[in-house]
Amino acid sequence: MNLSSLPFRLLAAAVALCAIAAPASAERIKDLAQVGGVRGNALVGYGLVVGLDGSGDRTSQAPFTVQSLKNLLGELGVNVPANVNPQLKNVAAVAIHAELPPFAKPGQPIDITVSSIANAVSLRGGSLLMAPLKGADGQVYAMAQGNLVVGGFGAQGKDGSRVSVNVPSVGRIPNGATVERALPDVFAGTGEITLNLHQNDFTTVSRMVAAIDSSFGAGTARAVDGVTVAVRSPTDPGARIGLLSRLENVELSPGDAPAKVVVNARTGTVVIGQLVRVMPAAIAHGSLTVTISENTNVSQPGAFSGGRTAVTQQSTITATSEGSRMFKFEGGTTLDQIVRAVNEVGAAPGDLVAILEALKQAGALTAELEVI
């Protein structure tokens, strides 16, 4: 790994986020929240992929593949003797998963993903035999079958040598499953619609209630908690859909995101929120020293000028490392200035991560620090 390029990645990530985290503008409710109960549901199943060109499971190491094939053949009226274990290379046991979209009706197709369970080299060219897809309640909601589309490529020699491009053991089947059972209607029998924010924020909830009341009349919406807004609605499904169509396009300005720093300790990437500030502090990390100081200046207007006395903060950041020159920064004490100071002296990403953690423990970093 070229460590000399890492400081520039740190700085680029910090500057990029500061550019992204601009003051919040008006956004639609449909971009900030989802309607309660309107969501997808996970489906999972097990099946067999056949027709592989010698790239299937090594059945001596995956006996369940043979057992599954015997069971399938038995259901089709073909009896395989119990003491016979066919050694096949064109069959693979697979897991199937999909998402049942909201309001899906019987007969509608959905996409599925097929993944090898055992030691198949590649699923390219294979066909999935009919397999049921079940929900968390154990009920069958869809039936899957079709020809796989595999983006990767894999091959294996007799001596065990192997070459692969991308991931050939996973494929997709567009419209590969047919919905057989519909989910219960979430719109039936209630006089309220609930809107759940994607992120918990009391300010956004308050502003959403105000925006809805302004558009539909006072008392239409009420805040339930930091995530949920309840909206009065008619019980007729058609009228509720019309209300939602108008409701999801109401615009409001969401609250500011909380001050947060996200650090990836493995790659050295640091993402800094716009509102992150650092209190005065001095840090010594090995041969690296970072000093933060803050001075208070008072601006006194002239007599009879009508002006007001103003207090301004002037911050100074310096970073030194053994054998390196000193760097000095003027202005507000923001975290991206510390990142710049640390990068200028050529510190490794691990140094910056350790400094951020120490600042948080000392109470000098007034933001949430998340290490991923």
UniProtKB/Swiss-Prot annotation:
GO terms for molecular function: structural molecule activity. It comes from Xanthomonas euvesicatoria pv. vesicatoria (strain 85-10). The basal body constitutes a major portion of the flagellar organelle and consists of four rings (L,P,S, and M) mounted on a central rod. One of its GO terms (cellular component) is bacterial-type flagellum basal body, distal rod, P ring. This is Flagellar P-ring protein. The keyword Signal applies. It is found in: Periplasm; Bacterial flagellum basal body. Assembles around the rod to form the L-ring and probably protects the motor/basal body from shearing forces during rotation. Keywords: Bacterial flagellum, Periplasm, Signal. Residues 1-26 form the signal peptide. Disulfide bonds: none annotated. Belongs to the FlgI family.
